[in-house]
Structures are given as structure tokens and as C-alpha cells.
Regions:
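Acidic/histidine-rich alpha-helical segments that form the ligand environment
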Residues: 59-72, 107, 123-163, 181
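Weak global preference for isoleucine
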Residues: 25, 32, 38, 56, ...
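A short, mixed-charge helix-start or loop-turn motif at secondary-structure junctions
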Residues: 46-53, 128-132, 169-176
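Short, contiguous alpha-helical
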Residues: 2-45, 80-122, 161-214
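Short, contiguous, helix-prone interaction/anchoring segments in small proteins
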Residues: 40-79
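Amphipathic, non-membrane alpha-helical segments in soluble helical-bundle scaffolds
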Residues: 50-61, 87, 91-94, 135-142, ...
Length: 214
């Protein structure tokens, strides 16, 4: 996740479609301002209170489905292209997101269940996923992350407002249920990058008379 994330474009069709299934996640994501997280933190706090975990879990599943659906529209060449963050490829960016979404929710679950390790390592943000991964493996990574999230979210239920020791260098500290929601916000940041890449491929001049994407 980059601290210099671009502000969302609220007129994107995919955004409105996703918001129907993930209103809290997309609503919090809309609060992002370039380089600042104060607005999204406020939105996350207001939407991830007591009793929110089960609803947020369903929304995370919808976001995971949207990620996989978008990945499946991309041509093979896209996964080695710039991924919209730092110098990562698309494959590295989505591999990063798959690991991050599971890790953030697992952190909330460990804190909620009283199992936070005393020797927990310092969080290192913006770690790229593996190089050279293709469509099928990225889809599997997202699916595996969602299974981890589903198990972890069950431990957060009833503990959404509990404090979590996770101290993220870019976000700071959030409560257990807030990490569940923020994982989805982070997903949508990368989903936006994927849509921009898909649009750029779709709109580039065709060299063989065929559309590039879609």
C-alpha cells in the first residue's frame, strides 16, 4: 500500500457496482485523499464498530470476487506490466494484496482472541509479491486469503472494538474490527489499479485488428 495512493474517481462504473455488495468497504475507500489517511481512518472507525464483523466478512468476499473477476479479464502480458505502485509488476502488486489482506485480518483475530505474540515483528509495509506469477496462481492466492479471512473473522466477532497492538507505519493502530474493514479498503486501492491497467490495455491502438482486452 502506498501512502501516495491516488484519490478515487467516484464515477467509475465498477465502483458503483461493487458498492452495492460492499457498501462499508467502498464507502471508507472513498474517503481516501492523496497521501493522507485521516479521512479513511474516520470512515473505518464509524463503520467497523461492535457487531460489524459478519457483515464486513461478506463484503470482503464480494471484493475478493471482484479482484478475481478483474484478474481474469487481463491478457497474459498484463501480469508483467507495471502494477501501479512503486516499480512492481501487476503480479507483484496483486500477490502483495493477497498476503496483506490475510495478514491484516489475522492480526485482528490474534488480538481479539488474546493470542497476540509478545515477540511480534515490526510491520514492514509495501512488500511486493513474487515475480512471474500468472492469472491462475494469483486467483488462487486471493481465494486462499479469503479462506484465512473467513476463519479469522469468526474470532473477531464480538471483539470488533477491542484494541489491536498492530502498529502499521502508514496507518497507525486500529481496533480489531477496523483491521477487518481496512483490509477491504486496501483491496479496493489495488482493484482500482487493476481497472486502470485494464482500461489502458482496452483503449490502446490495436495492432492486429483485434481488441486488446475484453
Amino acid at each position: 500500500m502506498s501512502a501516495a495512493a491516488q484519490a478515487p474517481t467516484v464515477t467509475d462504473d465498477w465502483t458503483a457496482e461493487l458498492e452495492a455488495d460492499a457498501p462499508d468497504i467502498v464507502g471508507a475507500w472513498r474517503g481516501i485523499e492523496a497521501g493522507q489517511f485521516i479521512s479513511v481512518r474516520r470512515e473505518v472507525r464509524s463503520r467497523a464498530g461492535a457487531g460489524s464483523a459478519e457483515a464486513i466478512l461478506a463484503q470482503l468476499e464480494a471484493v475478493a470476487d471482484a479482484l478475481v473477476a478483474t484478474i481474469e479479464t487481463l491478457p497474459d502480458e498484463a501480469f508483467a506490466m507495471p502494477g501501479g505502485e512503486a516499480d512492481w509488476t501487476v503480479a507483484e502488486a496483486i500477490g502483495h494484496d493477497a498476503a496483506a489482506r490475510a495478514g491484516l485480518v489475522l492480526a485482528g483475530a490474534l488480538a481479539a482472541s488474546g493470542r497476540w505474540p509478545a515477540d511480534a515483528p515490526t510491520v514492514v509495509p509495501s512488500v511486493a509479491g513474487p515475480v512471474g506469477v500468472g492469472r491462475d496462481e494469483l486467483a488462487r492466492k486471493i481465494a486462499r486469503s479469503q479462506r484465512i479471512i473467513a476463519r479469522s473473522a469468526g474470532q473477531i466477532v464480538g471483539h470488533e472494538a477491542d484494541p489491536c497492538p498492530l502498529d502499521h507505519p502508514l496507518v497507525g493502530r486500529l481496533r480489531c474490527g477496523e483491521w477487518l474493514l481496512f483490509a477491504g479498503v486496501h483491496d479496493v486501492m489495488h482493484l482500482q489499479q487493476l481497472h486502470r491497467i485494464a482500461d489502458s490495455l482496452r483503449n490502446r491502438p490495436a495492432t492486429d485488428g483485434r481488441p486488446s482486452v475484453g
